[in-house]
């Protein structure tokens, strides 16, 4: 048997053929831009988090009397431990940055529309899992901000009528954030990334059922090329740029995205003057603060994810690409500016004028999803280039 025949025989095996179908010979629109590379970057970030997390867990002790010191032990005594910790801590931020760009690219190019509704829904589930994973990972360092952040966020469950206090006690494993809470959060933080891997594979399989969208929103069976080698090379450029960007944070600004109070051991007696979550929680924190009543603030969080889930089912877009929808472009950039404003408001103290200003961005955020169907109707006069039967 020749080498070529042996290679072809291997590609026909079940696992090899699946990998070949989805990662090598996968038909891809020829006009994809670099914005379509953030999906593979997110996968790389997930692998980095799992690998560094496993090695860090080998040296971590999930006990309230030892957790903080075990983290310092990793930093001071374990060879390369500082690199592992900074890669893991900053890797979480890089992961969220990449996923945010991936989400906003999908919003701009309407990649969520028919027939890819399920792809979008799985993406929202993955995003929600990422938020929970990030929160459970913020507690194990057991610094002052970790302790009080866990106390404040878990206490929000008490706003649920009837069963709220019971849920809080169950989350804590007692009547306050203590050793049981730390063990639970550490265990969940170790488990959730592997659930994320499974959800990501489902997300990829759902995407490959109908194929990728493209910047023009034009579906064509003819104008497609195999993923390898063309887009591997294109993605490789993005991977190198990401590696440089990631390295700058690790080696030159490893603590910029953290909080200095987390270098103080957790102490339930003094309350920090300003409890601030990690930057990726700031928009949610701003929405929570925008409504004075705690129950109202908690209730405002659910519609954020409901709107993201419902967006693919707004059957109103005759033209998919924002290149042909100037009104949608303007609304999109307004949403992006609003998202940045939410992040800025979330890190400000709860005082005037930030309280008043903070009530405007959540309104604009929900307004975006309310008016999204309108530009699609207005733009129906522009030629509809998408002719796939699945979208009729």
From Swiss-Prot:
Transmembrane segment boundaries: 38-58, 82-104, 119-139, 185-205, 231-251, 295-315, 327-347, 354-373
Residues involved in heme b b566 binding: 102, 203
Record's subcellular location: Mitochondrion inner membrane
Bilayer topology annotation: Multi-pass membrane protein
Gene3D superfamilies hit by this protein: Cytochrome Bc1 Complex, Chain C (1.20.810.10)
Cofactor(s) this protein requires: heme b
Binding of heme b b562, residues: 88, 189
One GO CC term, this protein: respiratory chain complex III
A GO molecular-function annotation: ubiquinol-cytochrome-c reductase activity
Keywords (A to Z) from UniProt: Electron transport, Heme, Iron, Membrane, Metal-binding, Mitochondrion, Mitochondrion inner membrane, Respiratory chain, Transmembrane, Transmembrane helix, Transport, Ubiquinone
Organism superkingdom: Eukaryota
Main localization (coarse): mitochondrion
SUPFAM superfamilies: a domain/subunit of cytochrome bc1 complex (Ubiquinol-cytochrome c reductase) (SSF81648), Transmembrane di-heme cytochromes (SSF81342)
Pfam families in alphabetical order: Cytochrom_B_C, Cytochrome_B
One GO BP: mitochondrial electron transport, ubiquinol to cytochrome c
Keyword Membrane: yes
Cofactor note: Binds 2 heme b groups non-covalently.
Known function: Component of the ubiquinol-cytochrome c reductase complex (complex III or cytochrome b-c1 complex) that is part of the mitochondrial respiratory chain. The b-c1 complex mediates electron transfer from ubiquinol to cytochrome c. Contributes to the generation of a proton gradient across the mitochondrial membrane that is then used for ATP synthesis.
Subunit structure: The main subunits of complex b-c1 are: cytochrome b, cytochrome c1 and the Rieske protein.
Miscellaneous: Heme 1 (or BL or b562) is low-potential and absorbs at about 562 nm, and heme 2 (or BH or b566) is high-potential and absorbs at about 566 nm.
Family as reported in the entry's similarity comment: Belongs to the cytochrome b family.
Protein name from the UniProt record: Cytochrome b
Protein source organism: Pisum sativum (Garden pea)
Gene (name only): MT-CYB
């Amino acid at each position: 048997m020749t080498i070529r025949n042996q290679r072809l025989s291997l590609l026909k095996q079940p696992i090899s053929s699946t990998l070949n179908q989805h990662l090598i010979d996968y038909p891809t629109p020829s006009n994809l831009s670099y914005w379509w590379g953030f999906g593979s970057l997110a996968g790389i970030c997930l692998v980095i988090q799992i690998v560094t997390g496993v090695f860090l867990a080998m040296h971590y002790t999930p006990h309230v009397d030892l957790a903080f010191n075990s983290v310092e032990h990793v930093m001071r005594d374990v060879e390369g431990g500082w690199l592992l910790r900074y890669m893991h801590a900053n890797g979480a931020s890089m992961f969220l940055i990449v996923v945010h760009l991936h989400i906003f690219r999908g919003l701009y190019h309407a990649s969520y529309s028919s027939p890819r509704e399920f792809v979008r829904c799985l993406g929202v589930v993955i995003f929600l899992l990422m938020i929970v994973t990030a929160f459970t990972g913020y507690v194990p360092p057991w610094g002052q901000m970790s302790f009080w952040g866990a106390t404040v966020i878990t206490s929000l469950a008490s706003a649920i009528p009837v069963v709220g206090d019971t849920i809080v006690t169950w989350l804590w494993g007692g009547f306050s954030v203590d050793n049981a809470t730390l063990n639970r959060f550490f265990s969940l933080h170790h488990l959730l990334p592997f659930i994320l891997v499974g959800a990501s594979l489902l997300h990829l399989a759902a995407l490959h059922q109908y194929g990728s969208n493209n910047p023009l929103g034009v579906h064509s069976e003819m104008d497609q090329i195999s993923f390898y080698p063309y887009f591997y090379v294109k993605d490789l450029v993005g991977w190198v740029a990401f590696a440089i960007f990631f390295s700058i944070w690790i080696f030159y600004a490893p603590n910029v995205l953290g909080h200095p109070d987390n270098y103080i051991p957790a102490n339930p007696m003094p309350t920090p003057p300003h409890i601030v979550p990690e930057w990726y929680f700031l928009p949610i924190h701003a929405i929570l603060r925008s409504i004075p009543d705690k129950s109202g603030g908690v209730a405002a969080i659910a519609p954020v994810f409901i709107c993201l889930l419902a967006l693919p089912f707004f059957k109103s877009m005759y033209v998919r690409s924002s290149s042909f929808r100037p009104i949608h472009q303007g609304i999109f950039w307004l949403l992006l500016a609003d998202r940045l404003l939410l992040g800025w408001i979330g890190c400000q103290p709860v005082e005037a004028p930030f309280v008043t200003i903070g009530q405007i961005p959540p309104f604009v955020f929900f307004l975006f999803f309310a008016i999204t169907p309108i530009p699609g109707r207005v733009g129906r006069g522009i030629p509809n280039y998408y002719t796939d039967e699945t979208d009729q």
